[in-house]
Curated annotation (Swiss-Prot):
Gene Ontology cellular-component terms listed: cytosolic large ribosomal subunit
Pfam families in alphabetical order: Ribosomal_L3 (PF00297)
GO biological process, one term: translation
The protein's role, per its UniProt record: One of the primary rRNA binding proteins, it binds directly near the 3'-end of the 23S rRNA, where it nucleates assembly of the 50S subunit.
Single GO MF annotation: structural constituent of ribosome
UniProt KW Cell inner membrane keyword: no
Keywords from the UniProt entry: Methylation, Ribonucleoprotein, Ribosomal protein, RNA-binding, rRNA-binding
The protein's name in its UniProt record: Large ribosomal subunit protein uL3
Location of N5-methylglutamine modifications: 153
Family indicated by similarity: Belongs to the universal ribosomal protein uL3 family.
Quaternary data: Part of the 50S ribosomal subunit. Forms a cluster with proteins L14 and L19.
Post-translational modification: Methylated by PrmB.
């Protein structure tokens, strides 16, 4: 995997190109991610870069985590995340260093991961994109229901994983191949074309695309 950044979704707006075209963009605020630990194959069995992202008051950090931040010489963050990377990438960073929005360039394609909007309890039609039943002609009170979920006497049970009504949304979601329209290093902002998962203020992970369009 490649190195990415963790930021916060600010919201959506639009910008105009030099030709006057309106482009919808999502604004992400990416406070510089601080390197808290470098893991190598010799010491940890794998290579990865551990970073702290966001900001949090020191009074809200437990002693163990506060000591971890102090050892790295970085300010307290809202959380910690690891990016599995190669030895070549590790060589470019040191503990206590920063990774800024300049990791990305305008025009680059990225994958954005966040927690999708929660939509509460939903039926099987909406939740799993089932087809509705007939509106009339013999259908009585079975218009928008999933139908039978049962089996015969053998096996006599409902198999695990059966798609049923339940909570919709609030799950980890990735949108691939989104284009970075603008990088504002002065204000720590990324402007990404289109929509990204999650609500305003939600954490998102931005990585270089793994399925780059030909």
């Amino acid at each position: 995997m490649s190195l990415g950044l963790i930021g916060r979704k600010v919201g959506m707006t639009r910008i105009f190109t030099d030709e006057g075209e309106s482009v919808p963009v999502t604004v992400l605020e990416v406070v510089p991610n601080r390197v808290t630990q470098i893991k190598t194959a010799a010491s940890d069995g794998y290579t990865s870069l551990q970073v702290a992202y966001g900001e949090r008051r020191a009074s809200r950090i437990g002693k163990a985590l506060a000591g971890h931040y102090a050892k790295a010489g970085v300010s307290a963050g809202a959380g910690i995340k690891e990016f599995p990377v190669s030895d070549d990438v590790l060589a470019n960073y040191s503990v206590g260093g920063q990774i800024t929005v300049e990791l990305f360039q305008p025009g680059q394609l990225v994958d954005v991961t966040g927690t999708s909007l929660g939509k509460g309890f939903s039926g099987a039609i909406k939740r799993h994109n089932f087809s509705s039943n007939r509106a009339s002609h013999g259908n009585s009170r079975s218009h928008n229901v999933p139908g039978s979920i049962g089996m015969a006497q053998d096996p006599g049970r409902v198999f695990p994983g059966k798609r049923m009504p339940g909570h919709l949304g609030a799950v980890k979601t990735t949108v691939q191949n989104l284009e970075i329209v603008r990088v504002d290093a002065e204000r720590n902002l990324l402007l990404i074309k289109g929509a990204v998962p999650g609500s305003k203020g939600g954490d998102v992970v931005v990585r270089p695309s793994v399925k780059v369009k030909a």
